[in-house]
């Protein structure tokens, strides 16, 4: 059917590429491009002979708009799937505009020198993408991504009006390390060490990092402590879900993780301010990333499950209603299928699905759009087909 250019070759990209190759009737050809071409070549070698998808590789600096434009023109893809760093979203969007190519990502733009992510920079491209007749699909991972699809599905099929959304992200996995992150350490630590926030009554209310704690009993995992964080889908859901009064995002963390994180903060290792070290300027957090385990290597040693979903409260036919949509994913099952742990899997599968729905024309809406702005039904069907089956409850335990 078509061709995708996939930028990035980390843990999430590896999953998305595996899933594209399992779906070769749609992804007839892919090009994997990264700053380090050797990683792309190694993945190509691993996959060739197992798929009908034709795989090409390329080297590209995702910070270089001209290089990106040249690569897109050379490969002529139907869609660019951006699985690089959030700092590189805008350069890749610029290249897609210049070449009139559809764009998909999994995380919103964040300036490298400021630990603050929001959609305003990408939403500013709306008119230009619309005029070019191309679509930018923002946030096609799990959270953001599936959480937005869940919200759109709940509104379409279960509610007349949604008033409250609690997004719960639980990782009950154990990788055996004293401290490691399940996705890019730099992005993960910036996210969890920032102030939290939730959206209520038309505005964001800011909290201190890890200030608000709740306990929840997750199916397949058990009771876990979870903490309120700021997360990007709060911003788009507040805009796109009518009737909403409050949205919160909670993520689980173990005591060991939090203790190590506090220690690293106390000695300055989570700082993004440049320092001089032996005559060279380095950023402590980037140095820390270099010495921590690569999330892409955690698959064989991670056991347990993830449970991620949304609890909705609202009204149907004038009556109060509660509803819970969620997915449970097993780390070792993911590893057996694609060589990955479940955190990368739960992001990589939706990334492939979003690209697929643009490529096959199921979703066709020129402009810059968050995922909850599209019909959720094809995406929900694809989740069941491609390894992330969803479950539902009409009588969930609520978060206070």
PLM segments and residue spans:
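Helix N-cap at the beta1-alpha1 junction of Rossmann-like dinucleotide-binding domains, i.e.
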Residues: 36-39
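Rossmann-fold cofactor-recognition segment
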Residues: 50-64
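N-terminal Rossmann-like NAD(P) cofactor-binding module of classical short-chain dehydrogenase/reductase
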Residues: 72, 78-82, 103-104
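Glycine-rich Rossmann-fold phosphate-binding loop(s) that bind the pyrophosphate
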Residues: 9-10
